[in-house]
Amino acid sequence: MAEEERALLGPDGGDGGSAAPPRALPAVCDPSRLPHRLLVLALMCFLGFGSCFCYDNPAALQTQVQGDMKVNTARFMALYAWLGTVIFSIFVCVGQVIFALGALVNAFWLMEVGRFIFGIGGESLAVAQNTYAVSWFKGKELNLVFGLQLSMARIGSTVNMNIMGWIYSRVQDLLGHTGHATLGLTLLIGGITCLFSLACALILAYLDKRAEKLLCKEQGKTGEVIKLTDVKNFSLSLWLIFVICVCYYAAVFPFIGLGKVFFIEKFQFSSQEASAINSVVYIISAPMSPVFGILVDKVGKNIIWVLCAVITTLASHIMLAFTFWNPWIAMCLLGVAYSLLACALWPMVAFVVPEHQLGTAYGFMQSIQNLGLAVIAIAAGMILDTRGYLFLEVFFSACVSLSLVAVVMLYFVNHLTGGDLNWSAKKREKLQKVAANDLLYC
């Protein structure tokens, strides 16, 4: 490490009088250069792969879980109610193993405990992932980075949706019967992806510490520390972003969790067809998220993009609720809208809070989102058991409508307060250059 530090410091940075010039680090090993940052970005993306793969295990195996464990829809959706970087990745692995063991020993309560532990790690892992992103990438790069992270996460979800049913069938053929043992072994096989993400977390933690030392980055050098009392200083714009996040995702994740049976019952799809259309949101978001990230980077106007995404999502839910049109249309629209919203919404947090509060802000946003999802997931299961899918779709449409109201309010609040959330990319870049020059000559 000492040699690496001398390589970055240059001829004047070492002990005076060294005759031989220091050897420069290769680009891929130099944290100040693009190839190394791209390596870090790849690790960030894979950090959430295993978590997202295992997060949607219940959705991919809904009929098998309900049949093998003999639970109704409301009880099944409790698996989605406790959604909560090395420690967080370990939580994910332990939670997935306990979840699988619960099925092996035919104890649904143990499966719920496993999902609770998985949530502690999985959602804290998402906060760590977001904090890493804003630490390594700034300004116009941020939308693309969030898009790439979402893309890899959705690839994990898509692979899960399309392969877990097949794995269950192969395990069933191997054991010669269905039941809780078949389900448990299938879930253990799926948990292998968590070990892969844990390895990425370990490497990323090392690279981040190494970069801190090589680039002389000091934590908290301004004297400001991350603390929960930061919450009271959050602006109205940030709170509206929280509301948009909660209400929007409440109409996406619980819907996908219940979507397979919805398409079987309303549109008479086969189990395989239902799994395919239920995963199309994630299939679309995988390639489209980086594209939208670049688009938002180039254009700016984040609020307008969020508004378009919310309106499109509302239209797709209304189509699914009140028409018998080909559901592929609505689901493709939902996939496009979901990709666009994530690329435009999450980076806005970095525009409205100081850098030292980013960890607190993203953590609070994730916590509120998961509290909302916990309540909505249980409510959705109860509505489905008692009222059916039409009422459930109306409920999801109402959630998106609340998100739409919050977006409109955010637009006017941002306009009246002179905020920068809806600036064009050119204007933001110009003002950032002016601010940088002012700091240079201070």
Swiss-Prot record:
Bilayer topology: Multi-pass membrane protein
| Subcellular localization, as worded in the UniProt entry | Lysosome membrane
Q: Which keywords has UniProt assigned to this entry? A: Lysosome, Membrane, Transmembrane, Transmembrane helix, Transport
Q: What's said on domains?
A: The dileucine internalization motif is required for lysosomal localization.
Where the protein is mainly located, per its record? membrane
Q: What does this protein do?
A: Lysosomal dipeptide uniporter that selectively exports lysine, arginine or histidine-containing dipeptides with a net positive charge from the lysosome lumen into the cytosol. Could play a role in a specific type of protein O-glycosylation indirectly regulating macrophages migration and tissue invasion. Also essential for liver homeostasis.
Q: What is the protein's quaternary organization?
A: Homodimer. Interacts with lysosomal protein GLMP (via lumenal domain); the interaction starts while both proteins are still in the endoplasmic reticulum and is required for stabilization of MFSD1 in lysosomes but has no direct effect on its targeting to lysosomes or transporter activity.
**Residue positions of motif Dileucine internalization motif:** 8-9
Which gene produces this protein?
MFSD1
One MF term in the entry's GO annotations = protein homodimerization activity
Q: Which family does it belong to?
A: Belongs to the major facilitator superfamily.
> Which Pfam families does the record match to this protein?
MFS_1 (PF07690)
Q: What Gene3D superfamilies does this protein map onto?
A: MFS general substrate transporter like domains
Q: What is this protein called?
A: Lysosomal dipeptide transporter MFSD1
What's one GO BP annotation on this UniProt entry? protein stabilization
